[in-house]
Amino acid sequence: EGFEEEIKNNLNKYGEYLEDSILSVHMIKIEDKYYCMDFSCEEFEKIVNLLGSVESVYNLYYETLIKAINSDLGKYKPKRIGHLNLVRKYNKKFQYDYSNNKKLKELVKLISDRGYELDYNIAGLFKKDCGETYISGYLEELIKQYNIKLVLGSDSHSAKYIDKYEELNEHI
């Protein structure tokens, strides 16, 4: 949120050279300041305190994803959404039952209506405060209801996670 023109310009400049791209949200805007919601457990706690509840963090994350999907990023805009439940990265410490979250239902319906596909990745399995894939539980059930295409991914930011697909078999 707030960097749409810069993103669109970069996509217009480099989009023709990209085989694949993913639209994802890591930063959320509170008032006029940006916070990286998946940087650290301490940063996530700071965001919870600023917004007043874990539920409010989830809602703002989903609202930001809705804005990203609705934004005009040009003809090279990614058609896949990354780690849709990244907000759960610290769910072991910040528990929240999101099964009745209206914003999440609105988001999944929008993804379906717009024909997006979703990144189903295993990175969360290896995060000590997460322990689940970045599409699991209630969200996975909701996605199945809407018959949204999933694309397997590792979200590997280092070589040690590239070969972790055996773990994924347990979750499919």
Regions found by a protein language model. Name each.
Residues 94-172:
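Charged catalytic cores and adjacent phosphate/nucleic-acid-binding surfaces used
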